[in-house]
């Protein structure tokens, strides 16, 4: 599933061409993705101006004129791309993409040219909703999200407070979107490896006031922010379905230290990386380095 770095990469790719553009028409390739499209979705979008694009956690937000915002989630396999006539011919040979195009929006950019914004989703686990812009962050999907690991916003002190009485594992606590918003399986595994912390360790062990616990929490917070920053710089991680808006791939997956490396040697100690299952998700870690 695309995580914060992948969604932020998409936002940065779409923003230059979409900001200030006018929606000409919208066609839907199906009645629903994970959820049904909003009622009269095509008609409600036609003629609107896209004021700006933002992101909250793993949600991409299209702010429109008339005080409505499209809340988009990529699900497991969703992707956005922008086409003009030349790119349309190119993608016509990429059957997988064309076969699962479920949302096609024609728009006029500020340069006067006509483009198409296309949402593709083979598994249809993504979704699009319309929300009141003035009350956007009161929406049930957004109102309980925690801090984002951007620009060192997440600190050791913040994590310690969040982990008080948390009997769950560190892995589960970090996947809790009310604590750190936008983190997913990949980057939690990588941040824990960098911090020498086992995904099975209880979160509350970092919540004490001891100097050791404070240092561990501080280190973890810094590594979370660092790994997210590096992943954004690399254009995210391309695993299975995730691509940039032009169809190109991110390359942070080539920097993985543990994720997806079961049986391979840890680059620090030489011990083999192991995979365990926690709450139905794979966790990768080094049993020698991470305690």
UniProtKB/Swiss-Prot annotation:
CDD domains: EcFpg-like_N. It catalyses: Hydrolysis of DNA containing ring-opened 7-methylguanine residues, releasing 2,6-diamino-4-hydroxy-5-(N-methyl)formamidopyrimidine; 2'-deoxyribonucleotide-(2'-deoxyribose 5'-phosphate)-2'-deoxyribonucleotide-DNA = a 3'-end 2'-deoxyribonucleotide-(2,3-dehydro-2,3-deoxyribose 5'-phosphate)-DNA + a 5'-end 5'-phospho-2'-deoxyribonucleoside-DNA + H(+). Binds 1 zinc ion per subunit. Its cofactor is Zn(2+). Keywords: DNA damage, DNA repair, DNA-binding, Glycosidase, Hydrolase, Lyase, Metal-binding, Multifunctional enzyme, Zinc, Zinc-finger. DNA binds at residues 100, 123, 166. InterPro entries: DNA_glyclase/AP_lyase_DNA-bd, DNA_glyclase_Znf_dom_DNA_BS, Formamido-pyr_DNA_Glyclase, FPG_cat, MutM-like_N-ter, Ribosomal_uS13-like_H2TH, Znf_DNA_glyclase/AP_lyase, Znf_FPG/IleRS. Involved in base excision repair of DNA damaged by oxidation or by mutagenic agents. Acts as a DNA glycosylase that recognizes and removes damaged bases. Has a preference for oxidized purines, such as 7,8-dihydro-8-oxoguanine (8-oxoG). Has AP (apurinic/apyrimidinic) lyase activity and introduces nicks in the DNA strand. Cleaves the DNA backbone by beta-delta elimination to generate a single-strand break at the site of the removed base with both 3'- and 5'-phosphates. Monomer. HAMAP family: Fapy_DNA_glycosyl (MF_00103). This is Formamidopyrimidine-DNA glycosylase.
